[in-house]
A protein has these predicted regions:
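A short, Lys/Arg-rich alpha-helix, primarily the initiator
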Residues: 1-38
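Short amphipathic recognition helices of helix-turn-helix/homeodomain-type DNA-binding modules
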Residues: 2-9, 13-14, 67-71, 75-106
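Amphipathic, well-packed alpha-helical segments that form the structural scaffold of globular domains
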Residues: 14-21, 88, 92, 116, ...
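An N-terminal domain-cap segment
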Residues: 24-38, 96-117
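Recognition helix of helix-turn-helix/homeodomain-like DNA-binding domains
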Residues: 30-34, 40-41, 47-64, 74
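Hydrophobic protein-protein interaction segments
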Residues: 109-127, 133-286
């Protein structure tokens, strides 16, 4: 079964090789270098594989390699843990690839109760494609008050975090550093594509974003990967102004992801978040 999400091992190796400076590896920059980064023979030597074999991998004459070889190449290219995991995924054949099992895009009743009970935390349930399957009032108020609260429950118009980031000006203007936010969106999408190379809906999402956003297309081509599970973001919110929030992600039993945003206790940011909740309550009572 063919892979429909393009996760090209050869071009990924080439981009990672071009990123490494010879000096980082203790290599003399001997002679004039026509191209950035390490030469193929240098990577092969550092990884302990033949230059011919490494070249075949990079030129896609060999589609896969053993995990041991891939780990050696990852060390030679100084890949991060997330980049190494991605390399192992795209460089190893999928065992007995099946049509992807239909993913359950429903939020369980207990998870829905949990969402509702997280009062001072903005929380949402996402699938791996970053479609929003459910959110609590605060998440809705923080990110998408211009959409109906029931939008996640309607599959045909379900909001997608990455599409909103690139294609919805209301959301785009929320981030104090939109460039950093969009880069982390794309590096995450690239990371999870290693696990879901046969998913037509993921391929469709990537295709749609590539056509509709030049910025997305440029970032996607860079092939950077990271599994963005926690960190902090600075918002410039139209209702409460500047807001710095920490975020974390947790895997749910059904394969979906619980994403939540919270402020540092007793900080001005917590006060701003509470103001957003008060504003919310006043809206509910009118």
């Amino acid at each position: 079964m063919e892979e429909i999400v393009n996760t090209d091992l050869g071009s990924y190796l080439r981009q990672m090789r071009e990123r490494v400076r010879p000096e980082q590896m203790g290599l003399q920059a001997r002679g004039s270098r026509r191209v950035p980064g390490l030469r193929r023979e240098e990577v092969a030597a550092l990884a302990g594989v033949s230059q011919t074999y490494y070249t075949r991998l990079e030129q896609a004459q060999t589609a896969h390699a053993s995990p041991q070889v891939l780990l050696s190449i990852a060390r030679a290219l100084q890949l991060s843990a997330d980049e190494r995991d991605y390399l192992l995924k795209i460089g190893t054949p999928v065992q007995n690839p099946q049509q992807p099992a239909p993913h359950d895009d429903q939020v369980s009743p207990s998870t829905r109760m949990l969402l509702g009970s997280l009062g001072n935390v903005a929380a949402a349930v996402l699938n791996y494609r970053c479609d929003i399957l459910g959110w609590n009032s605060l998440y809705h108020r923080l990110f998408a008050p211009h959409l109906g609260f029931d939008a996640p429950e309607r599959p045909e118009q379900r909001p997608n975090v990455i599409k909103m980031n690139f294609l919805d000006d209301n959301v785009r203007s929320l981030y104090a550093d939109w460039a950093a936010e969009s880069e982390s969106n794309v590096t995450y999408l690239r990371f999870i594509s290693g696990d879901h190379r046969h998913d037509p809906q993921l391929a469709e999402l990537i295709g749609e974003l590539t056509i509709q956003s030049e910025e997305f297309a440029a970032l996607w081509c860079r092939q950077r990967v990271s599994n963005c599970i926690e960190g902090s973001k600075l918002f410039d919110h139209p209702v409460v102004g500047e807001l710095e929030l920490m975020y974390q992600s947790a895997d749910l039993q059904d394969g979906n992801i619980l994403k939540f945003y919270h402020a540092e206790p007793d900080s001005p940011h917590e006060a701003a978040l509470q103001l957003l909740m008060v504003d919310l309550d006043s809206v509910h009572h009118h």
